[in-house]
């Protein structure tokens, strides 16, 4: 018997990407597809690329329509998913692609999101190292509630986590700059996302430690490092529809810097990800490009040592809608249900 799945928020980019992946999942039967303001519309009017689901009608975004499924994906703005999730049955696997359940500390949530904290769920980044040589996927095997990471934190955490897990990096001097495609800002019409504003131009935003993903990045790195990690994070809007390129740098521990070559430092990342199907530390001299991961759940990483400054430089690329959102959601679902982790996620990147 197939697994019945409902998707809430199906008219947006994240919800549409969840449906795209589920449409190719061999163990899934797509049930209710819901939306808020677009309820009653044909899915094909809003997600024209989803041909096999085009004639499905979007139902009202209500608990009544979502309950009764084995799995519910919530692809909703922050604040909305927490309210619905609290009313869903405990036996339903609920996967929140929004921000509501990512942060551990209520104070951090209130500071950056300016609303009441909905609580914390297990973090849906399976490859993230946790205590005693384990991975976050162990936390996902026995849960019915999963918080999908933000797209920027996904690229940043996967870039730096191996170094912090190995005790190779200092916690007080971490700088992360990420360039993202416009789909990361959602579907709502905004002047700064118009083609005439974006094409041929790049611009930073959320500068000065105010971007909402900053505490999530610090939370993830701190949990890996076992101490408080402070991050300077700057996001940049790039003239592309999807993809994230992150350049993350951190000071290497002085004693390690004296005793370790650049090749040995890089090997920390190679060893950390050698058994991970979706994460690829590229051959030396090959730098990751967003094009290579578009539409896929894969991650490209390269590591270098700046010997002059004593900093490690890690570049990572993801598709913000796939590994950065929907791919992580489906991957986490597979783990929680005891399925093969790569089901519905075997697509390779699209190039050129």
From Swiss-Prot:
One of its GO terms (molecular function) is NAD binding. It comes from Renibacterium salmoninarum (strain ATCC 33209 / DSM 20767 / JCM 11484 / NBRC 15589 / NCIMB 2235). The active site is at residue 151. Catalyzes the NADPH-dependent reduction of N-acetyl-5-glutamyl phosphate to yield N-acetyl-L-glutamate 5-semialdehyde. HAMAP family: ArgC_type1. Belongs to the NAGSA dehydrogenase family. Type 1 subfamily. Keywords: Amino-acid biosynthesis, Arginine biosynthesis, Cytoplasm, NADP, Oxidoreductase. It holds the Pfam family Semialdhyde_dh. Its main location: cytoplasm. It catalyses: N-acetyl-L-glutamate 5-semialdehyde + phosphate + NADP(+) = N-acetyl-L-glutamyl 5-phosphate + NADPH + H(+). Pathway: Amino-acid biosynthesis; L-arginine biosynthesis; N(2)-acetyl-L-ornithine from L-glutamate: step 3/4. It is found in: Cytoplasm. InterPro entries: AGPR_AS, AGPR_type-1, NAD(P)-bd_dom_sf, NAGSA_dehydrogenase, Semialdehyde_DH_NAD-bd. This is N-acetyl-gamma-glutamyl-phosphate reductase. One of its GO terms (biological process) is L-arginine biosynthetic process. It is an enzyme of class 1 (oxidoreductase). Its EC number is 1.2.1.38. GO terms for cellular component: cytoplasm.
């Amino acid at each position: 018997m197939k697994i019945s799945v409902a998707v809430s928020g199906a008219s947006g980019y994240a919800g549409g990407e969840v449906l795209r992946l589920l449409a190719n999942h061999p163990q899934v039967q797509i049930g209710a597809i819901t939306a808020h303001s677009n309820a009653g519309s044909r899915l094909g009017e809003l997600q024209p690329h989803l041909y096999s689901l085009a004639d499905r009608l979007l139902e009202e975004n209500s608990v009544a329509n979502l309950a009764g499924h084995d799995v519910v994906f919530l692809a909703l703005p922050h604040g909305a998913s927490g309210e619905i999730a609290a009313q869903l049955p405990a036996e339903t696997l609920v996967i929140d692609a929004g921000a509501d359940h990512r942060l551990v500390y209520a104070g951090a949530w209130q500071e950056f999101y300016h609303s009441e904290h909905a609580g914390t769920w297990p973090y849906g980044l399976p490859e993230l190292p946790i205590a005693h040589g384990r991975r976050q996927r162990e936390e996902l095997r026995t849960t019915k509630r999963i918080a999908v990471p933000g797209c920027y934190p996904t690229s940043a955490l996967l870039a730096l986590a191996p170094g912090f897990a190995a005790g190779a990096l200092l916690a007080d001097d971490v700088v992360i700059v990420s360039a993202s495609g416009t789909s990361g800002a959602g579907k709502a019409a905004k002047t700064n996302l118009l083609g005439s504003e974006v094409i041929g131009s790049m611009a930073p935003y959320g500068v000065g430690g105010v971007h909402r993903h900053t505490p999530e990045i610090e939370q993830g790195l701190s949990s890996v490092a076992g101490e408080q990690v402070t991050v300077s994070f700057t996001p940049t809007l790039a003239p592309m529809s999807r993809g994230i390129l992150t350049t993350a740098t951190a000071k290497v521990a002085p004693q390690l810097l004296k005793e370790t070559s650049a090749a040995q430092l890089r090997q920390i990342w190679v060893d950390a990800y050698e058994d991970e199907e979706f994460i690829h530390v590229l051959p030396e001299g090959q730098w990751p490009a967003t094009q290579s991961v578009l539409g896929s759940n894969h991650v490209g990483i390269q590591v270098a040592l700046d010997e002059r400054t004593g900093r490690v430089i890690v570049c990572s690329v993801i598709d913000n809608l796939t590994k950065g959102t929907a791919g992580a959601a489906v991957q986490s679902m597979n783990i929680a249900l005891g399925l093969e982790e790569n089901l519905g996620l075997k697509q390779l990147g699209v190039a050129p």
